[in-house]
Structures are given as structure tokens and as C-alpha cells.
Amino acid sequence: MSETTHPTFAMVAGELSGDILGAGLIKALQHQYPDARFVGIGGPRMEALGFESIFSFEELAVMGIVEVLSRLQRLLKVRKTLIDEICSIEPACFIGIDAPDFNIGLELKLKARGIKTVHYVSPSVWAWRPKRIFKIAKATDMVLSLLPFEKAFYDKHDVPCTFVGHTLADDIPLISDKTAARNLLGLDADAEYLAVLPGSRGGELKQLAEPFVKAASLIKKRYPDIRFVTPLVNQKRREQFEEALKLHAPDLEITLVEGHSREVMAASDCILLASGTATLEAMLVKRPMVVAYRVSPITYKIAKGMMQIDQYSLPNLLSGETLVTELIQENCTESLIADAISEQLDSDFSPLKEKFMQLHKGLKCNASERAAEAVIKLIQ
């Protein structure tokens, strides 16, 4: 292994957001190491840069405690195979990108075998299950955090952490172009649009497609001229959403788009979306939003007992105040969603837009380059 000129970086990315972060990090590392090898689990953006996937990253796209338990045997088998493969490769370091319940355990095993480990995207230890910090301390040589308030938490526990900012804040312009987004998507330049984003995972659509399309039907009755547009991550999710549409709102017209979720948000006047990274994107494109989310009752009951926070969306967590409406679990109903969207459509968005702008500027730090610098410093 030649770490100085031709290093191998092992990586595991969970979900689309991890694929985006992984691709940015690979690009930044390739500037320093043009002949580096990247191997593990990654998505299409990472693979387009030469990443070698041992397993499909769909393997890790599991939501909820109950849902994870149902696939636990498969996940453990994937992790064992990865440990063997990565140890045989002897990488300069391993970088786990998000997916903490999978990656932290993997990092623990790899670090015990002498491989340097980095965890990119801090688990929400400040939000729930705070005692995970002790396992993270054992498992990682460095945590790369995306959010500014996270580093103080790690410093308090003497865990090496570097705040790098967020690649989405770097990629999305401070002022998003609604007209350009509509032209790209072939949407009406003058119509009012509500973007409906029920999530990227099958489990999310199973929980959210019904209340989202029912809410859209109610909104259509209140605002007859409004139009709807929904991005779906792939054909499988599109078919799943179309099934829900047919079942719960057969007369509702929604423009369906494969991919282009960011452009859909930029093209919209208001956004209804699932909790998660998408709430950050919605904030960064400066659009009013309503966040709604639910999981299985058992998952929620277990998770609720471990939560340290009472807000879930990133705009609210970053600001420390309630900037956006959150409708969680039993509040995730079509009537409450429709009321919240109506309030956004009828309100002056200017003060909130300015707050979103300030939050955007605080996260815009050339994250991929800063993350790469931290990794390079670790392996040199």
C-alpha cells in the first residue's frame, strides 16, 4: 500500500444524501490523489467517479427500528463481508458516511484491526441516545460534522471532531432561480405550484403517500388554480406513489418527475415534505415549507422514549426556534397538513426567507474540501 501517492479509501454511504456527500468528498480527495482507489458501498454519484461498490447502497435504505429488525440478519451479513473485504484491501482509512447504526459498528471492528476510521455526518447524539458518544469515541479517529452546534458537543466529550459545513449549502446558490427550474422541468411559468415530497425510501412512501395526496386534494378544493409536482427517486418509488394516488386521490393531477428533487423545490411556491435532509434543501432554496412525518407506532413509541429534542426539522434545529411547522406521527393527517399549507400560501414569506438566508451563509464553508483536508491530515 502506498498511502502517499496511490491510497485506497474504503467508504460506506447510506441513502441518497450519503451518496451526494460521498461524491463531493471523492472529488476533493482526487485533487490530491488522482490515482486513489475508492471502494465499499456507494450510490450512482459516487460510482460515476470510479467508486467500486461491493454491495448496492439500497441495502442500507431501511427506515425505523422495527423495519431494521426485520432485515437485521441481512445487514449483519453485509457488514461481516465488508469487514473481510476492507481488511484484505488495507485502505489508508475507512470513511463511514451517515448510516450510523450500520457504520459505527463497522468502524468499531475496523479500528480494532488497525484501520483509521472517519465518520462523516455526526449521528444525532445531541438529539437522542446521547450515550452513543462513548461508542463513537471508541469507533472513530475523527468525526466530520455538518452542523455548527455539533462540534461543541464532541469537544465536551474529548472526541476529535471537525466542523466542515454542508455540501448542499455550497452547491445551492444563495438565490435560487425559480424560472430556470420551471423551464428545466417544463412547468407553467405563471402557475402556483406546491411541491409534494413524500420521501425517497419505500417505507417513507408507505407511511406518507396517503396523507400527502389526500392533503393535496383538500388544498386543490381551497385553491382551484394550484398545481402539484412530485419528484420520485426512481421508477419503483414512482409506481408506489402512483398506486397511492390511484387509491386515495384518483382525480388529482400531479406532475411526476424522476429525480430533480432540488429543481422541483426551486420551481415551487411552497413545499410539503418528509422530515430529513430534504428539509435542509428546502431551506437552502428559500421556500416556505410544511414538514410531516410518521413511522410505525412501535418504532415511534421506542424512539420517543429516547429523544432529547422536541423539534425534528433541520431549519428548526439550526435556528433554535420554530421556523417551520412540523406535523409528526398522529399530527400527520391530511386535514392538519392542508391547514398548515394554506397558512403558508396565505402568509408573507419575506421575514422567514431572510432567516433562511442567514442560516445558509453559516453552512456555506466548502465542505467537501474541508472534509478532504481533515482526512488527508489524518492519514499523513
Curated annotation (Swiss-Prot):
Pfam families: LpxB. Pathway: Bacterial outer membrane biogenesis; LPS lipid A biosynthesis. It catalyses: a lipid X + a UDP-2-N,3-O-bis[(3R)-3-hydroxyacyl]-alpha-D-glucosamine = a lipid A disaccharide + UDP + H(+). It is an enzyme of class 2 (transferase). GO terms for cellular component: membrane. Coiled coil: none annotated. Its EC number is 2.4.1.182. GO terms for biological process: lipid A biosynthetic process. SUPFAM superfamilies: UDP-Glycosyltransferase/glycogen phosphorylase (SSF53756). CDD domains: Glycosyltransferase_GTB-type (cd01635). This is Lipid-A-disaccharide synthase. It comes from Shewanella sediminis (strain HAW-EB3). The lineage of its organism: Bacteria, Pseudomonadati, Pseudomonadota, Gammaproteobacteria, Alteromonadales.
